[in-house]
From Swiss-Prot:
Name of this chain's protein: Ribosomal RNA small subunit methyltransferase A
Gene source species: Chromohalobacter salexigens (strain ATCC BAA-138 / DSM 3043 / CIP 106854 / NCIMB 13768 / 1H11)
PANTHER family attached to this UniProt entry: DIMETHYLADENOSINE TRANSFERASE, DIMETHYLADENOSINE TRANSFERASE-RELATED
Principal location class: cytoplasm
Cellular component annotations (GO), alphabetically ordered: cytosol
PROSITE patterns, per the entry: RRNA_A_DIMETH (PS01131), SAM_RNA_A_N6_MT (PS51689)
Protein backbone atom coordinates (compact mmCIF):
# COMPACT_ATOMS: atom_id res chain seq x y z
CA UNK A 1 0.00 0.00 0.00
CA UNK A 2 1.36 3.49 -0.78
CA UNK A 3 2.95 5.16 2.23
CA UNK A 4 0.18 7.63 2.95
CA UNK A 5 0.85 9.91 5.92
CA UNK A 6 -1.36 8.80 8.80
CA UNK A 7 -2.08 11.07 11.69
CA UNK A 8 -4.37 11.39 14.66
CA UNK A 9 -6.06 14.66 15.52
CA UNK A 10 -4.13 16.94 17.87
CA UNK A 11 -5.60 19.34 20.46
CA UNK A 12 -6.27 22.89 19.27
CA UNK A 13 -9.31 25.11 19.01
CA UNK A 14 -12.20 23.12 17.55
CA UNK A 15 -13.09 25.86 15.12
CA UNK A 16 -11.85 24.89 11.64
CA UNK A 17 -10.41 27.53 9.34
CA UNK A 18 -12.44 28.74 6.37
CA UNK A 19 -11.98 26.84 3.11
CA UNK A 20 -13.16 27.57 -0.40
CA UNK A 21 -14.35 24.62 -2.50
CA UNK A 22 -11.85 23.74 -5.23
CA UNK A 23 -13.01 22.96 -8.73
CA UNK A 24 -9.99 20.78 -9.50
CA UNK A 25 -10.99 18.44 -6.67
CA UNK A 26 -14.66 18.51 -7.70
CA UNK A 27 -15.60 19.78 -4.25
CA UNK A 28 -19.22 20.44 -3.28
CA UNK A 29 -19.76 20.51 0.47
CA UNK A 30 -22.91 18.98 1.95
CA UNK A 31 -24.77 21.42 4.23
CA UNK A 32 -28.34 20.14 4.68
CA UNK A 33 -28.61 18.62 8.18
CA UNK A 34 -31.77 16.73 7.26
CA UNK A 35 -29.97 14.99 4.40
CA UNK A 36 -26.95 14.30 6.61
CA UNK A 37 -29.14 12.68 9.28
CA UNK A 38 -30.87 10.54 6.66
CA UNK A 39 -27.55 9.35 5.24
CA UNK A 40 -26.30 8.35 8.69
CA UNK A 41 -29.56 6.46 9.35
CA UNK A 42 -29.23 4.38 6.17
CA UNK A 43 -25.58 3.64 6.94
CA UNK A 44 -26.55 2.60 10.49
CA UNK A 45 -22.95 2.56 11.79
CA UNK A 46 -21.99 0.48 14.83
CA UNK A 47 -19.04 0.78 17.17
CA UNK A 48 -17.83 -2.76 16.35
CA UNK A 49 -17.36 -1.86 12.67
CA UNK A 50 -14.41 -0.28 10.86
CA UNK A 51 -15.54 2.82 8.98
CA UNK A 52 -13.53 4.57 6.26
CA UNK A 53 -14.70 7.89 4.83
CA UNK A 54 -13.38 9.06 1.46
CA UNK A 55 -13.14 12.82 1.05
CA UNK A 56 -14.48 14.10 4.38
CA UNK A 57 -14.29 17.69 3.15
CA UNK A 58 -15.34 19.94 6.03
CA UNK A 59 -16.65 17.07 8.13
CA UNK A 60 -20.40 17.21 7.47
CA UNK A 61 -20.70 13.41 7.61
CA UNK A 62 -17.58 12.89 9.68
CA UNK A 63 -18.99 14.47 12.82
CA UNK A 64 -22.23 12.44 13.08
CA UNK A 65 -20.35 9.25 12.20
CA UNK A 66 -17.84 9.90 14.96
CA UNK A 67 -20.64 10.74 17.37
CA UNK A 68 -22.27 7.41 16.51
CA UNK A 69 -19.26 5.10 16.72
CA UNK A 70 -16.34 7.04 18.23
CA UNK A 71 -13.78 5.82 15.67
CA UNK A 72 -13.33 6.75 12.02
CA UNK A 73 -10.56 6.80 9.41
CA UNK A 74 -10.70 9.30 6.57
CA UNK A 75 -8.82 9.66 3.29
CA UNK A 76 -8.32 13.25 2.16
CA UNK A 77 -6.37 14.53 -0.85
CA UNK A 78 -6.75 18.28 -0.29
CA UNK A 79 -3.92 19.25 2.06
CA UNK A 80 -5.61 22.55 2.85
CA UNK A 81 -8.54 20.73 4.45
CA UNK A 82 -6.47 18.51 6.73
CA UNK A 83 -5.56 21.14 9.36
CA UNK A 84 -9.24 22.01 9.74
CA UNK A 85 -10.19 18.36 10.19
CA UNK A 86 -7.40 17.90 12.72
CA UNK A 87 -8.67 20.89 14.69
CA UNK A 88 -12.34 20.03 14.41
CA UNK A 89 -12.00 16.46 15.67
CA UNK A 90 -9.05 16.72 18.07
CA UNK A 91 -11.18 15.37 20.94
CA UNK A 92 -11.77 12.05 19.16
CA UNK A 93 -8.69 9.91 19.91
CA UNK A 94 -9.70 7.27 17.35
CA UNK A 95 -10.05 9.71 14.46
CA UNK A 96 -7.32 8.96 11.90
CA UNK A 97 -6.47 10.94 8.76
CA UNK A 98 -4.81 9.26 5.75
CA UNK A 99 -3.48 12.02 3.51
CA UNK A 100 -3.54 10.94 -0.13
CA UNK A 101 -5.49 10.03 -3.24
CA UNK A 102 -8.24 7.42 -2.79
CA UNK A 103 -7.62 6.31 -6.39
CA UNK A 104 -4.16 5.13 -5.32
CA UNK A 105 -5.10 3.90 -1.86
CA UNK A 106 -4.72 0.20 -1.00
CA UNK A 107 -7.97 -0.63 0.79
CA UNK A 108 -7.14 -4.33 1.05
CA UNK A 109 -3.88 -3.54 2.84
CA UNK A 110 -5.70 -1.18 5.19
CA UNK A 111 -8.19 -3.91 6.12
CA UNK A 112 -5.32 -6.28 6.87
CA UNK A 113 -3.68 -3.96 9.39
CA UNK A 114 -4.65 -2.16 12.59
CA UNK A 115 -6.12 -3.44 15.85
CA UNK A 116 -8.66 -5.66 14.07
CA UNK A 117 -6.84 -7.08 11.02
CA UNK A 118 -9.14 -8.78 8.56
CA UNK A 119 -12.27 -6.96 9.68
CA UNK A 120 -14.04 -5.83 6.49
CA UNK A 121 -14.28 -2.11 5.84
CA UNK A 122 -17.42 -0.04 5.56
CA UNK A 123 -16.56 2.63 3.00
CA UNK A 124 -18.46 5.92 2.91
CA UNK A 125 -18.09 9.08 0.89
CA UNK A 126 -19.48 12.10 -0.88
CA UNK A 127 -17.43 11.38 -3.99
CA UNK A 128 -16.30 14.12 -6.37
CA UNK A 129 -18.15 13.75 -9.66
CA UNK A 130 -14.93 13.76 -11.68
CA UNK A 131 -13.48 10.61 -10.07
CA UNK A 132 -16.57 8.61 -9.08
CA UNK A 133 -16.45 6.01 -11.87
CA UNK A 134 -12.69 5.23 -11.73
CA UNK A 135 -12.87 5.15 -7.93
CA UNK A 136 -15.69 2.61 -7.97
CA UNK A 137 -13.69 0.40 -10.36
CA UNK A 138 -10.69 0.76 -8.03
CA UNK A 139 -12.77 -0.23 -5.00
CA UNK A 140 -14.16 -3.26 -6.81
CA UNK A 141 -10.63 -4.65 -6.95
CA UNK A 142 -10.62 -4.61 -3.12
CA UNK A 143 -14.15 -5.97 -2.73
CA UNK A 144 -12.96 -8.93 -0.63
CA UNK A 145 -11.91 -6.49 2.09
CA UNK A 146 -15.11 -4.44 1.99
CA UNK A 147 -18.40 -5.15 3.79
CA UNK A 148 -20.36 -2.43 2.01
CA UNK A 149 -20.11 1.02 0.45
CA UNK A 150 -22.40 4.03 0.79
CA UNK A 151 -21.73 6.86 -1.63
CA UNK A 152 -23.25 10.15 -2.63
CA UNK A 153 -22.77 10.45 -6.38
CA UNK A 154 -24.15 12.37 -9.30
CA UNK A 155 -27.68 11.07 -9.79
CA UNK A 156 -26.90 10.00 -13.35
CA UNK A 157 -24.04 7.81 -12.11
CA UNK A 158 -26.26 6.14 -9.50
CA UNK A 159 -28.86 5.46 -12.19
CA UNK A 160 -26.17 3.83 -14.30
CA UNK A 161 -25.02 1.70 -11.37
CA UNK A 162 -28.57 0.50 -10.69
CA UNK A 163 -29.73 0.25 -14.33
CA UNK A 164 -31.40 -2.77 -15.88
CA UNK A 165 -30.58 -4.42 -19.24
CA UNK A 166 -32.25 -2.69 -22.16
CA UNK A 167 -32.36 0.72 -20.52
CA UNK A 168 -30.45 3.73 -21.81
CA UNK A 169 -28.37 3.82 -18.62
CA UNK A 170 -27.22 0.18 -18.88
CA UNK A 171 -23.54 -0.06 -19.73
CA UNK A 172 -20.10 -1.23 -18.67
CA UNK A 173 -20.33 0.43 -15.24
CA UNK A 174 -23.70 -1.24 -14.58
CA UNK A 175 -22.48 -4.68 -15.64
CA UNK A 176 -19.19 -4.68 -13.77
CA UNK A 177 -20.68 -3.27 -10.58
CA UNK A 178 -23.67 -5.63 -10.58
CA UNK A 179 -21.42 -8.60 -11.33
CA UNK A 180 -19.55 -7.89 -8.09
CA UNK A 181 -22.17 -6.18 -5.91
CA UNK A 182 -25.80 -5.76 -5.01
CA UNK A 183 -26.76 -2.19 -5.89
CA UNK A 184 -29.41 -0.22 -3.99
CA UNK A 185 -30.44 3.22 -5.27
CA UNK A 186 -31.55 4.72 -1.95
CA UNK A 187 -32.67 8.32 -2.41
CA UNK A 188 -32.10 11.57 -4.31
CA UNK A 189 -30.29 14.55 -2.79
CA UNK A 190 -31.28 17.95 -4.25
CA UNK A 191 -28.63 20.36 -5.50
CA UNK A 192 -29.57 22.95 -2.88
CA UNK A 193 -28.21 20.65 -0.15
CA UNK A 194 -24.65 21.64 -1.21
CA UNK A 195 -22.35 24.64 -1.21
CA UNK A 196 -21.45 25.59 -3.88
CA UNK A 197 -24.66 24.38 -5.48
CA UNK A 198 -23.88 21.87 -8.27
CA UNK A 199 -25.70 21.95 -11.59
CA UNK A 200 -27.05 18.41 -11.14
CA UNK A 201 -28.82 16.36 -8.49
CA UNK A 202 -27.07 13.72 -6.44
CA UNK A 203 -28.23 10.39 -5.04
CA UNK A 204 -27.21 7.93 -2.35
CA UNK A 205 -26.27 4.41 -3.42
CA UNK A 206 -25.41 1.30 -1.40
CA UNK A 207 -23.06 -1.35 -2.85
CA UNK A 208 -22.78 -4.70 -1.07
CA UNK A 209 -20.14 -7.05 -2.51
CA UNK A 210 -21.43 -10.55 -3.25
CA UNK A 211 -19.91 -13.40 -1.27
CA UNK A 212 -20.10 -15.27 -4.58
CA UNK A 213 -21.23 -13.68 -7.87
CA UNK A 214 -24.68 -14.95 -8.97
CA UNK A 215 -23.10 -15.81 -12.35
CA UNK A 216 -19.45 -16.84 -12.11
CA UNK A 217 -16.95 -15.89 -14.81
CA UNK A 218 -14.18 -18.48 -15.06
CA UNK A 219 -11.68 -15.74 -15.90
CA UNK A 220 -12.72 -12.40 -14.41
CA UNK A 221 -10.02 -10.44 -16.24
CA UNK A 222 -11.27 -11.85 -19.54
CA UNK A 223 -14.85 -11.08 -18.51
CA UNK A 224 -13.86 -7.46 -17.91
CA UNK A 225 -12.21 -7.32 -21.35
CA UNK A 226 -15.30 -8.79 -23.04
CA UNK A 227 -17.58 -6.26 -21.33
CA UNK A 228 -15.33 -3.37 -22.32
CA UNK A 229 -15.16 -4.54 -25.93
CA UNK A 230 -18.89 -5.25 -26.12
CA UNK A 231 -19.77 -1.73 -24.96
CA UNK A 232 -16.96 -0.05 -26.89
CA UNK A 233 -19.40 1.05 -29.59
CA UNK A 234 -22.92 1.02 -28.20
CA UNK A 235 -24.61 1.56 -31.56
CA UNK A 236 -22.81 -1.34 -33.17
CA UNK A 237 -23.96 -4.95 -32.95
CA UNK A 238 -22.34 -7.69 -30.93
CA UNK A 239 -21.13 -9.27 -34.17
CA UNK A 240 -19.17 -6.10 -34.92
CA UNK A 241 -17.89 -5.36 -31.41
CA UNK A 242 -16.81 -8.93 -30.65
CA UNK A 243 -15.79 -10.01 -34.15
CA UNK A 244 -12.28 -10.95 -33.02
CA UNK A 245 -13.69 -13.14 -30.25
CA UNK A 246 -16.67 -15.04 -31.70
CA UNK A 247 -17.85 -16.32 -35.07
CA UNK A 248 -21.37 -17.28 -36.15
CA UNK A 249 -20.88 -20.86 -34.93
CA UNK A 250 -20.04 -19.58 -31.47
CA UNK A 251 -23.06 -17.26 -31.40
CA UNK A 252 -25.27 -20.18 -32.38
CA UNK A 253 -23.80 -22.33 -29.61
CA UNK A 254 -24.49 -19.53 -27.13
CA UNK A 255 -28.04 -19.05 -28.48
CA UNK A 256 -27.45 -15.29 -28.57
CA UNK A 257 -28.37 -13.22 -31.62
CA UNK A 258 -25.20 -11.41 -32.75
CA UNK A 259 -27.40 -8.74 -34.30
CA UNK A 260 -28.30 -7.48 -30.83
CA UNK A 261 -26.73 -4.38 -29.34
CA UNK A 262 -24.67 -4.61 -26.14
CA UNK A 263 -27.10 -2.69 -23.95
CA UNK A 264 -29.66 -5.50 -24.36
CA UNK A 265 -27.40 -8.12 -22.75
CA UNK A 266 -27.80 -9.21 -19.14
CA UNK A 267 -24.90 -9.90 -16.79
CA UNK A 268 -25.66 -13.62 -17.13
CA UNK A 269 -25.40 -13.48 -20.94
CA UNK A 270 -22.14 -11.56 -20.82
CA UNK A 271 -20.72 -14.11 -18.37
CA UNK A 272 -21.74 -16.92 -20.73
CA UNK A 273 -20.01 -15.16 -23.62
CA UNK A 274 -16.81 -14.70 -21.60
CA UNK A 275 -16.86 -18.30 -20.38
CA UNK A 276 -17.36 -19.59 -23.94
CA UNK A 277 -14.38 -17.54 -25.12
CA UNK A 278 -12.30 -18.87 -22.21
CA UNK A 279 -13.30 -22.49 -22.87
CA UNK A 280 -12.68 -22.37 -26.62
CA UNK A 281 -9.45 -20.37 -26.59
CA UNK A 282 -6.58 -22.16 -28.39
Amino acid sequence: MPDFPKEHATPMSNRPPAHQARKRFGQNFLRDTGVIDRIVRVIAPRSDQRLIEIGPGQGALTEPLLDAVGALEVIELDRDLIPGLRVQFFNYPDFVIHEGDALQFDFAALAAEGETPGKPLRVIGNLPYNISTPLIFHLLTARGAIADMHFMLQREVVERLAATPGSAAWGRLSVMTQYHCRVDNLFVVPAEAFTPRPKVESAIVRLIPHDEPPHVAHDEALFGDIVREAFGQRRKTLRNNLKTRLDDTAWAALDIDPGRRPQTLSVEELVRIANHVAETAP
